[in-house]
Amino acid sequence: LLNEIAWTRVLIMVVGGSTYAFTLILLVFLLGIGLGSIIVARRSAPRAETAATAALAQGMTGVGAALLFVFFGLLPSYIIAVFQVPAWNAASRLVLMGVAVGAVVLIPAIGMGMTFPLLTDLTARSRTARGADVGSAYALNTIGSILGAVLTGFVLVVALGTQTTLRVGLVVNGLAALALAWLAARGVAEGSTEDRRLRVRVLSAAGLGTLALVAAAAAPGWSTRLIDLGPTIYARQPMDRVARQRFLEHRGVRQLAFREGANATVSVWEGESGRSLRVNGKVDGSDRGDMDTQVMLGLAPAVARAGATSALVIGYGTGVTAHVLATVPSVQRLKVVELEPAVVQMDSFFVGVNGSVLARPGVRVVIDDARSAFQLDRERYDVIVSEPSNPWVAGVATLYTPEFFRIARARLSDDGVFCQWIQLYQLPLPIVAGIVRSLHEVFPYVHVWFGGSADLVVLASPRPITYDRMWLTQLLGPGGQLKTLTREWLSIDNADQYFGRMLLGDSGVARLISRATLEHSDNQPRLEFVAARRFLDPGADAYVVFDSLIQLGRGDAGTSPFALLRILATRRSDAGVLPYLDAAHRAQPTVFEWSVRTAGIRLALGDTAQADSLLATVTGRSSGASPDALQMRGLLAAARNRPLAGMALREALAAGADTGQLRAALALLAARGASWAEAASQARGSLSVARGTFRHPYPGEFLSQALSQIALDAPAGLADSLLGYAVGRRPGSARYRELAAVAALRAGRCEDAAASFVELLDFAVQRDNGPALVRECWTTQDSTVRIGGGSRGAAARRVQEKH
């Protein structure tokens, strides 16, 4: 089982971790074993011939297993091609993925299927006790399978990794082939009839065995960047050749950590959009894009259960949800249940958003399956949060059944609140309704809240869910310990804004449940298969489902579509919000906020003309314009390089708008005018105050353009100092590192420029002319001619031309 387990761990990283993917790998493996057994069935041959055939089978197994090292680099490209044809459905894609799995699994599986009956025949003591011999062989095979599974899954993969484990398998197959070939040749007289009959088989087996050993030692491996692509998840959008290459290289992001645990492969990546946690190639949390959902999963149940003293979280992820619950002033005891230890080991990469929650007193981590942990636990909790991965991931759907919810309810205090995360992507409304119905079967009171752009936070309780505004103010109001988190990531300043995130109350949930078509239970786990098919053949748009939920919630007490829309528009680059903003503008044409928010998204998308026309009517009323409107006016003026842009930006600053964004635009204006000291001062100020949150995002194109001009044309020392500071503030930005290399070249700091070029390789950004430019820098340093901005400046510009 060593090969089978290692193959599975590698292949699910490419074909996805759904039940169908696991079934596909197992199907091909069993097919190969069956074919191998058929090939050698009902044969009776002398022992030497049996040994020679077994040697050939083991050699074929080893060489066939080595094909994974040859073909693996091609598999992601193949999977991308499979998902680039929209007309293909789930069944077609499964068949095509089966071809890929068969290419690397079928041949060695056939060899394994041949080996067992041959070795059973070979170890038989006589022809008269076949039953006992076969029984003994099966017993040994079963013991070996158990030991192989335990040793591989819990020791070899964890300690050595799958690549080395596969190489160990090649060594075993190669040595077995050579040993059996020697056994077949032993005692056979050279030149005899038997020798002539066995020679080709024995020599072939010895050659294949030797080739397997050579492959174990010398076969090129694959990079952890390549194995961590997740092509079935993230390569669905149309791609041209350049985009495909960028995807395959993970260009622009770097891998900070990679660990193969007993249950999953876990990694941490960093790029312009922050850090993300990947489990089996799928992002399961981040320090930016998922922050609203992660915060809301902790906040919503804490608000609904005022004064909660104990909480339990299923799934650690980045630790943000646990951090929110641990920060609630009344919580004294927090338990985190996490299946994969490697996830917890990645905690240190997210201390910026999880507040080192695991180091707090009263916080405890249990490494176990959620069901097992609940059944072994005798404590009760005021709040339980279940945030597993997507239901299409194999095994996860068991955490969405009524049976599991009953287990959770048994661990909940009488007035406790259970919180369930539901992902809207790739799940149509009837399936979402089915999950909520399963919850409602166990908990009579259910409310649905908005988590993120494609996430629901569902609250359930055995008693009516009530909300204490005084408790909410204590958490989020002035001096509240969650004020900063909720303000920056949820754009909540007061209680009314919090309740704007409510989607469905009691009556809305009743209407949603009436739409349910999915029956999912432990005995009939349909969700696992339905969700996996939807994953392979996506047809449900998250915003379509979200729109249906808004319609179902109309009229519920406490729900407000316009308040919810303000929250949706917090993500300023989300084009999916535009139809809702257009509808709001038609419904409330005198509310200029909708035009301002639309303009902000249009500007983020690069559509300055449309944004400009939207703002024309708003900013014409300068005396009554909001800080956001003034900010949009200033940013648009800067984007279009208008004469009074600087004045507009400073007016917005005085009104209290986003300092980071405005100072970035001022830096660009100063750089355009070659006012380098002013440009550097504004850029440094922008970097120093930027928070990278949804409310105060990192300055984007304005700051990048300003830094680019400063790196190329500002005084070398000034540019070098500023770009070094920029990299320190944004270590995940490959663009800033490239500009830092430019500035270092101009400043004559050749070694630092070389170091920056090397660091760029971690981001899959390679400058072919980098070594030559560094050598030129060193040559210039050694010369007696002072170049200043001459040769070094030209070298720096050649870096940009390559870009």
Place the predicted regions along the sequence by residue.
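Structural motif corresponding to the intra-repeat A-B loop/turn of tetratricopeptide repeats
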Residues: 571, 605, 639-640, 673, ...
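Residue at a conserved register position within TPR or TPR-like alpha-solenoid repeats
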Residues: 568, 602, 637, 670, ...
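Alpha-solenoid helical repeat scaffolds
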Residues: 562-563, 593-597, 627-632, 661-668, ...
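Short coil turns that delineate tetratricopeptide repeat
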Residues: 589, 623-624, 657, 691-694, ...
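Alpha-helical transmembrane segments of multi-pass membrane proteins
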Residues: 1-474, 529-531
